């Protein structure tokens, strides 16, 4: 089979305790747009980047929400032209553990990044686009 024209996309499905509330929060805080909504399960996108919401199913131990287990093992990265404005918007909508944007020296140059935790326990990092702009440059190896 010739896969030369095949493409692959990667997305995340966020398990949340309250699906419909999560959809409204991501709309208000991130400017997410709804692709489809089945009630408790929804497809959204931010600036064309899709992600999905699924309300936690009681008893389904393989897919608990962060609020059920008291932690998350994933950090979601958002790259934008104005990281501070997005973090401020999330904070105004009820985000917690807000970290203001600060400068970080990286192999690809200065990277401005901050973050927050959404009301459903997911950790978000929000930064400028420097990591995306400089991906073509080889990084120094070990």
Language-model features and meaning:
Residues 120:
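Conserved ATPase active-site switch/coordination loops adjacent to the nucleotide-binding site
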Residues 14-18:
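Short, surface-exposed ligand-recognition loops at beta-strand->loop->(often short) alpha-helix junctions
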Residues 1-13, 23-117, 127-142:
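Vicinal oxygen chelate
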């Amino acid at each position: 089979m010739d896969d030369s024209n095949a493409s692959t996309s990667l997305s995340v499905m966020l398990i949340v305790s309250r699906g419909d509330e999560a959809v409204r929060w991501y709309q208000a805080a991130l400017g997410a747009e709804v692709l489809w909504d089945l009630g408790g399960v929804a497809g959204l996108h931010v600036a064309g980047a899709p992600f999905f919401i699924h309300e936690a199913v009681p008893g389904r131990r393989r897919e608990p929400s962060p609020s059920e287990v008291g932690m998350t093992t994933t950090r979601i990265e958002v790259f934008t032209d104005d990281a501070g404005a997005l973090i401020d918007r999330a904070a105004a909508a009820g985000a917690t553990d807000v970290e203001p944007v600060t400068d970080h020296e990286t192999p690809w140059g200065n990277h401005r990044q901050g973050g927050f935790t959404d009301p459903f326990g997911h950790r978000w990092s929000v930064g400028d686009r420097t990591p995306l702009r400089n991906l073509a440059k080889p990084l120094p190896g070990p």
